[in-house]
Swiss-Prot record:
Residues reported to bind ATP: 37, 76, 472, 509
EC number annotated for this UniProt entry: 6.3.5.3
Listed GO biological process terms: 'de novo' IMP biosynthetic process; purine nucleotide biosynthetic process
Name the record gives this protein: Phosphoribosylformylglycinamidine synthase subunit PurL
Organism the protein comes from: Pyrobaculum aerophilum (strain ATCC 51768 / DSM 7523 / JCM 9630 / CIP 104966 / NBRC 100827 / IM2)
The encoding gene: purL
Length: 697
């Protein structure tokens, strides 16, 4: 994507001349939407990011959150939507590789991956091809570098048939004294380590800053190629190199162009780079191509001349190719050389930030919720439970190695969030979960984004975690489309409101624009990943019950079926408003779960598919039936279908000898039975239920 006429004029005016080919390439990459956030950063600054436990927030490759004395967690989310649409395998694999390298930049050990995936209907051949290969790419890369994929979420929606939303989150831990010190001074060296530069991924950031067309093959060259073997070498290298370096940076989107510009800006120093010194896999490359190549599995290390030998020794030990490509200066300019000749000389003040570009906004009104007839309840329950969105996702996560690293306490499907043991601090654990609901954010972007936040918050709370911090990913269409830009702005406001109300700072995130196919934008998708601390992993809650347990519902069900799975699956409607949020109730819910820690057999959040889906999932996961009087659940609705399928917030199910909330029945036997008083409204064998709720892909 070319620079805009206004941007070109700004560059010419500042330089007093035409930019050189290499300078133009730098601006084209670094000022792309993908790298510069020029259309979004003025809004993202509104998000709360500070708290006493936040050591480092947004602005660098990875944040740091203190989880225990002298121990930090880091987590980061990344989107790889455009590459995954064109080359699903490599698009997904390189997304995983890139997010792992972000975590490495703070010296952390990557301990887990989560994926939030949004595909077209599994019955559609093209959507299925994308889904199968995205899953394969994630699995192959994660398994080969030894980082477990421990959880996530998968959505199916017609809008994602040709334009998937593929999000990867990596979690890492690092001791306080293991974080590179940061800082740089004139004379410090810039080293590029990893694969040799080649033409794979050329223009990747510009590619991610435009919409997709039917001629996707022409963009294949903009998709990077993954190399998990080198990715594993970089993980091992960073583990030992922390004492040899001052600063580490991923060499990702925008290539060396963005890396050099960001390093110069962070340290407010000039840079001199000799582009011909970089090691190349393709010796036919010119300086502009070297500068903007997005070859994967590469990192930048900043070190002092006195520590160079220390770093070189480790690079050779792990057989990682490297080049000394530049140094910092006091001049405040970015100088680029090729075979001794200056091919670019730019003031840092011009390079650092693309001019902000706000766009017009245009609100829209979603379809109001019409009166819908009450359907045959048994058929409606079967329809909701068999929905690909509600179904168990074994067909996906069984392809992942979720046990490698032996930290996984709650595996995919066992609870509402993944739980990881932090052996470095006894029984301490981390709980982490990502959530999104594209229907909610279509109907009301602000309330939908807040719902994504509260759902992830509640999932972490229900397994026994204390939510600490969040990262987000906002995925919408072209910012030049007023309705899409309005969706983005409203989503930011929803995230801000939720973060402030819950006291959970947003420490990082990712915005992906231009998610369109043939001029049609996807449903706006806002994913939120919440990370929390579990004080004792032996007391976490699985989403199960045992024979003889009482079953309890905490929280009130309201007439809230707007945007629900029930409304879509049974009535074919996407209409109304997402569920309302009472943040005081959500915080009370989190406190109640922690109060009951170690005394429950299990617990589960009530969300997608309502009480019917949550109760059925606990039965199927346990392999044990239950007899539930659904009409005993606290509610303000007079309709049985709304009671069963409302997706009201502020609710969870508990199982145990005793439990919080209202007792609605007991677990036991081979049948899952729902009744209203003496009237049975649904009855199925548990083994039939498990089959009904299994995803086929």
């Amino acid at each position: 994507m070319a620079l805009s006429p206004g941007e070109l004029e700004l560059i010419r005016s500042a330089l007093g001349r035409e930019p050189t080919e290499v300078e133009y390439a730098l601006f084209r990459s670094h000022w792309s939407e993908h790298c510069s956030y020029k259309s979004t950063r003025m809004w993202l600054r509104r998000l709360p990011s500070k708290a006493p436990w936040v050591v480092r927030g947004p602005g660098t490759d990875a944040p740091l959150v203190e989880i225990a004395e002298g121990l930090y967690a880091t987590f980061k989310i990344e989107s790889h939507n455009h590459p995954s649409a064109v080359d699903p395998y490599n698009g997904a694999a390189t997304g995983v590789g890139g997010i792992i390298r972000d975590i490495l930049t703070v010296g952390a050990r990557p301990i887990a991956l989560l994926v939030n995936l949004h595909f077209g209907p599994p019955s559609h051949p093209h959507a299925r091809w994308i889904a199968v290969n995205v899953i394969r790419g994630i699995s192959d890369y994660g398994n080969r570098v030894g980082v477990p994929v421990v959880g996530g979420e998968t959505w199916f929606h017609e809008d994602f048939t040709y334009t998937p939303i593929v999000l990867a989150t990596c979690v890492g831990i690092v001791e306080k004294d293991g974080v590179p010190p940061g800082g740089a001074e004139p004379g410090d060296l810039i080293i590029v380590a990893g694969l040799g530069a080649d033409k794979s991924g050329l223009g990747g950031s510009a590619f991610a800053s435009k919409t997709l067309s039917e001629e996707a093959e022409e963009d294949l060259g903009a998709v990077q190629v993954a190399d998990p073997l080198m990715g594993k070498k970089l993980i091992d290298l960073v583990r030992e190199a922390r004492s040899c370096v001052k600063f580490i940076k991923d060499l990702g989107g925008g290539g060396l162009a963005t890396a050099l510009a960001e390093l110069a800006e962070w340290f407010q120093l000039g840079v001199v780079a000799e582009l011909d010194k970089i090691h190349m896999a393709d010796r036919e490359m010119g300086p502009a191509e070297v500068l903007t190549s997005e070859t994967q599995e590469r990192m930048v290390f900043v070190t002092s001349p006195s520590k160079l030998e220390c770093l070189e020794r480790l690079l050779e030990k792990f057989e990682v190719p490297y080049s000394i490509v530049g140094r910092f200066t006091a001049e405040g300019r970015v100088v680029l050389k090729w075979r001794g000749e200056v091919v670019g000389d730019l003031p840092l003040s011009l390079v650092a930030k693309a001019p902000e570009t706000p766009w017009p906004q245009e609100p829209y009104a979603p379809p109001p919720l019409p009166h819908v007839p009450e359907p045959p309840i048994e058929k409606a329950i079967d329809a909701v439970l068999s929905s690909p969105n509600v179904a168990f996702k074994q067909a996906i996560y069984e392809r992942f190695d979720f046990d490698v690293g032996v930290r996984t306490v709650l595996k995919p499907g066992e609870g509402d969030a993944a739980v990881l043991k932090i052996y470095e601090r006894g029984n301490l654990g981390l709980a982490v979960k990502g959530d999104a609901n594209p229907r909610f954010t279509y109907l009301n972007p602000r309330l939908g984004a807040a719902n994504a936040f509260i759902k992830a918050y509640r999932n972490v709370a229900v397994v026994g975690g204390r939510p600490l911090a969040a990262v987000d990913s906002i995925n919408v269409g072209s910012p030049s489309r007023p309705s899409a830009y309005w969706q983005f702005v409203e989503a930011v406001e929803g995230l801000r409101e939720a973060a402030e109300a819950l006291g959970v700072p947003i420490v990082g995130g990712k915005v992906s624009l231009y998610n369109e196919y043939k001029g049609k934008p996807v449903a706006p998708t806002v994913a939120v990943v919440v990370l929390g601390v579990v004080e004792d992993v032996s007391k976490v809650n699985k989403a199960v019950w045992k024979e003889g347990d009482g079953v309890y519902v905490w929280g009130v069900t309201k007439d809230e079926v707007g945007g629900s799975e029930y409304l879509h699956r049974v009535h074919g409607l996407v209409a109304g408003q997402p569920p309302s949020i009472d943040y005081s109730v959500e915080k009370e819910l989190a406190a109640v779960v922690r109060k009951w820690a170690g005394r429950l057999t299990g617990a589960k959040d009530v969300g997608l598919g309502g009480l019917a889906a949550a109760l059925a999932k606990m039965a199927a996961a346990s392999g044990i039936g239950a007899d539930i009087d659904i009409c005993k659940a606290p509610s303000t609705t007079a309709r049985l279908d709304y009671l069963l399928f409302s997706e009201s917030n502020g609710r969870f199910i508990a199982a145990g000898e005793e439990g919080p909330g209202t007792r609605v029945g007991a677990a036991g036997g081979d049948y899952f039975t729902l009744r209203c008083g003496s009237t049975i409204v649904y009855k199925r064998k548990v083994e039939e239920l498990a089959e009904l709720m299994s995803l086929k892909i």
